[in-house]
């Protein structure tokens, strides 16, 4: 199975900060990767598909990039509403696998 190693598991940042989180695939050369945001009690929301494509309606402060088997989600200017858990999903190889998640908190 392809393991998705996500880091950090949690982070705290201030409003306006640039925030990054990463997922590294344990193997595979043509990984198709999505990034999701999940808030407590809510269904996951798709942010980025195909590693770097912004889903319709998602603010442009979110962006995704890829370098080999390393994938990065960046939030360019942190807002209060961004407090959530973020996770990646690879859906190129069965079984599809998720990263462990990054819990993002706002530093007060």
Curated annotation (Swiss-Prot):
GO biological process: one example: immune response
Segments of this protein annotated with the region Framework-1: 1-23
Disulfide bridge positions per record: 23-88
Region (Complementarity-determining-1): 24-34
Alphabetically ordered keywords of this record: Adaptive immunity, Disulfide bond, Immunity, Immunoglobulin
Further remarks about this protein from its record: This chain was isolated from myeloma proteins that bind beta(2-1)-fructofuranosyl moieties (inulin).
Protein name: Ig kappa chain V-V region J606
Species assigned in the record: Mus musculus
């Amino acid at each position: 199975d392809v393991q998705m190693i996500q880091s950090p598991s949690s982070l705290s940042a201030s409003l306006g900060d640039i925030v990054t989180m990463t997922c590294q695939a344990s193997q595979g050369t043509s990984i198709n990767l999505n990034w999701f945001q999940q808030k407590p009690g809510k269904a996951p929301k798709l942010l980025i598909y195909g590693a770097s494509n912004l889903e319709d309606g998602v603010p442009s402060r979110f962006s995704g990039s890829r370098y080999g088997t390393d994938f990065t989600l960046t939030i360019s200017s942190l807002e209060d509403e961004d407090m959530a858990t973020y996770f990646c999903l690879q859906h190129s190889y069965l079984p599809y696998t998720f990263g462990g998640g990054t819990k993002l908190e706002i530093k007060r």
